[in-house]
Amino acid sequence: MLKFTGNCLIVPWDFSEMALAALKTSVAMVDDRAKIKVIHVGQIPTSTEPTVIWDTITEQSIQEYASKSFQKTVADHPELSGLELVTLFGDPGFAITDYAQEIAAELIVISSHGRRGLSRLFMGSVAERVVRLAQVPVLVLRGPAD
């Protein structure tokens, strides 16, 4: 396993098994877990017609849900202890790369879900966008193809 000798790396967190693999890989790459910044990018749903459900989804509720879910994951995987989650909002590609620049991160470790064909066309690829936008190296961990 390669060792990361820089000061800071970012791991985007989307609650998936692949994101968990990226976290575990990052932990194995560093000597000091404080170098790892785990981020989740939340998006508030938009609708042309406001409804009751949209009123209950706020940045605070997204942040609380992400924090609780991440804490549960850390509790289930002791090797991740000491990691903390930062929640950002906006377009995931821009939010991840802007935050990397803001905190002078030297590496982004991101998972890719392995989408192909129409699934990739319609859902896009955050990992691909991060690779295109990032000013720092990006390590992409590929998942199995759908």
Label each residue range with its predicted role.
Residues M1, Y99-D146:
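Gly/Ser-rich helix-loop-strand patches that form or flank binding pockets
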Residues M1-F4, A75-I108, D146:
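Structural beta-alpha unit
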Residues L2-V52:
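Small/aliphatic-rich secondary-structure junction motif
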Residues V30-D31, P78, Q135:
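Short conserved AdoMet
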Residues K37-I39, L83-L88, L139:
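General small-molecule cofactor/ligand-binding pocket signal
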Residues D55-K68:
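A short acidic, glycine-rich active-site loop
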Residues Y65, T87-D91, H113:
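Short beta->alpha linker loops
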